[in-house]
Amino acid sequence: MQEMLIKLIKIYQKATFFKPASCRFYPSCSNYSIEALRKYGIVKGGWLTVKRLARCHPYNPGGYDPVP
């Protein structure tokens, strides 16, 4: 299941390759998600991803935000 989610994220990354980057953070939200899923698994990694996506909006200054 974890690898399937990671593959879906990679498909998303390839599908949006030509779209200008809009993520306010480094690493990007999709790369953060892959790293969180690999490090913590589906439950905790998924929760970290949801929290990160909730912070990725125009009113947040963004910046460097690694997976804990």
Swiss-Prot record:
<keyword id="KW-1003">Cell membrane</keyword>
<dbReference type="Pfam" id="PF01809">
    <property type="entry name" value="YidD"/>
</dbReference>
<dbReference type="InterPro" id="IPR002696">
    <property type="entry name" value="Membr_insert_effic_factor_YidD"/>
</dbReference>
<comment type="similarity">
    <text>Belongs to the UPF0161 family.</text>
</comment>
<dbReference type="GO" id="GO:0005886">
    <property type="term" value="C:plasma membrane"/>
</dbReference>
<keyword id="KW-0472">Membrane</keyword>
<protein>
    <recommendedName>
        <fullName>Putative membrane protein insertion efficiency factor</fullName>
    </recommendedName>
</protein>
<comment type="function">
    <text>Could be involved in insertion of integral membrane proteins into the membrane.</text>
</comment>
